[in-house]
Curated annotation (Swiss-Prot):
GO cellular-component term (any): exodeoxyribonuclease VII complex
Cell compartments where the protein resides: Cytoplasm
Protein name: Exodeoxyribonuclease 7 large subunit
Family of the protein in this entry: Belongs to the XseA family.
Organism of derivation: Staphylococcus haemolyticus (strain JCSC1435)
Length: 445
């Protein structure tokens, strides 16, 4: 009798077969994400599909944390996974270990990451933007030597501002060698001393334009000292070169427009300036003519002598006043000199000298008498003080029979300072006597 298998047993057997097949344990798969969900646990659940089939898939939190982008519905992805069976539902599904964007999606991811990095470093800040010269003498054009871009730029410059010298620098704008060629030619153009540099090319896919998203190209544009207009692709195309350039043009033609003034507009401005200047000069001359006519009608201009008659008379008056003033000054000085001469004669001078001599002798005599009197008085005062000092001297006192008692080199002035058997010294006029106190008697005893 045949043995019937349970659903669980069959499911486990199928899972065992899947898990043991080496071809299913490490597969590379590409497809589109659908029904994408991120669980609160951090695990990812989604389907991978192409136009004909759908496979269930999941990615554990640990692997999901290693992703360099945020997966979303509709992303084209490349997966590294293993195939197994989810026993509870009996479905086979893939367990994804690695995931990355496929093709263009990966390029857009790299573009966004580099854009954010450069933005954070300040490469796109407005303070670094240089103004485009209004009237350029030389314009360097960096683009392919053939193609619509160079033709559009040259024809536009020729029609708008033929005075500008165009320096075409043939540059690779696509391919593996384009990046280095773009960088080299930007540095070369910067060294030429041109006024403006146009870097551009025609439109294309993101892969075609990718060289203008390279970090080294962006830095070369940023470091360039000459103003740069970026004209890469069509109006809807954007590259990192557009963000870092001083000005972004939607097309190569627009770049040429931004780099040059319009000669016809300039001619109109010049004509307007000529008209305004002519009108101003005409109005100014009319005003001056009117003023001249008004002055010419003034009565003094009809009789020119009236302009200077009064001035001549005024000059004569000033001359007379000046002459009178000088004569008056001279007479005054003569008078002062005469007075001085009268006051200053020999006789008067001799009398003055003689009188001063007499006064000097009198002062000298008075001073001498006063000095002698002061000396005499001082001598008497000194003598009296010396006599007084001698009378008060201890030596004179001892000459009269008195003595001075010393104890321990101190003068004794009272019996209260002595005791029996004290050793004392008696100072007399002709020497000292050492003695011992036998008895002390006070006056009140």
């Amino acid at each position: 009798m045949s043995e019937y298998l349970s659903v669980t047993t069959l499911t486990k057997y199928i899972k065992y077969k899947f898990d043991q097949d080496p071809h299913l344990q490490s597969i590379l798969l590409k497809g589109e994400l659908s029904n994408f969900k991120k669980h609160s646990s951090g695990h990812l659940y989604f389907n991978v599909k192409d136009k004909d089939s759908v496979i269930s898939a999941m990615m554990f939190k640990g692997n999901a944390n290693q992703l360099t982008f945020e997966p979303k519905e509709g992303d084209e992805v490349l997966l590294e996974a293993r195939v197994s069976v989810y026993e509870r539902r009996g479905n086979y599904q893939i367990y994804v270990n690695k995931m990355e964007l496929d093709g263009i999606g990966n390029l857009y991811q790299k573009l966004e990451q580099l854009k954010q990095k450069l933005k954070k470093e300040g490469f796109f800040n407005n303070e670094h933007k240089k103004p485009i010269p209004r009237f350029p003498k030389k314009i360097a054009i960096l683009t392919a030597s053939t193609g619509a871009a160079i033709r559009d730029i040259q024809s536009t410059i020729n029609s708008r501002y033929p005075l500008a010298e165009k320096i075409q620098i043939s540059t690779l704008v696509q391919g593996t060698q384009a990046k280095e060629d773009i960088i080299k030619n930007i540095k070369y153009a910067d060294s030429l001393g041109v006024d403006t540099i146009i870097v551009g090319r025609g439109g294309g896919s993101i892969e075609d334009l990718w060289n203008f998203n390279e970090e080294d190209v962006v830095k070369a544009i940023f470091e360039c000292q000459t103003p740069i207009i970026s004209a890469v692709g069509h109006e809807t195309d954007f590259t990192l070169s557009d963000f870092v350039a001083d000005v972004r043009a939607a097309t190569p033609t627009q770049a040429a427009v931004m780099a040059t003034p319009d000669q016809y507009e300039l001619m109109q401005q010049i004509k307007q300036y000529q008209f305004s200047l002519s009108r101003y000069i005409k109005q100014y001359l009319e005003k001056q003519y009117k003023q001249l006519d008004h002055l010419a009608s003034y009565y003094k201009f009809k009789q020119p002598s009236l302009l200077y008659d009064q001035q001549i008379q005024r000059k004569d008056d000033l001359e007379r006043q000046l002459t009178q003033l000088l004569l008056s000054k001279i007479e005054n000085k003569k008078y002062q000199l005469k007075v001085l001469h009268q006051n200053f004669n020999v006789k008067t001078l001799n009398q003055t000298i003689l009188q001063n001599k007499r006064q000097l002798v009198n002062v000298k005599n008075r001073l001498s008498n006063l000095t002698m009197k002061n000396i005499h008085n001082n001598k008497l005062e000194f003598k009296n003080k010396v006599e007084l000092l001698n009378n008060l001297s201890p030596t004179n006192t001892m000459l009269r029979g008195y003595s001075i008692i010393n104890k321990d080199d101190k003068v004794i002035t009272s019996t209260q300072d002595l005791s029996k058997d004290d050793e004392i010294t008696l100072a007399m006029k002709d020497g000292n006597v050492d003695a011992i106190v036998k008895k002390v008697r006070c006056e009140h005893e």
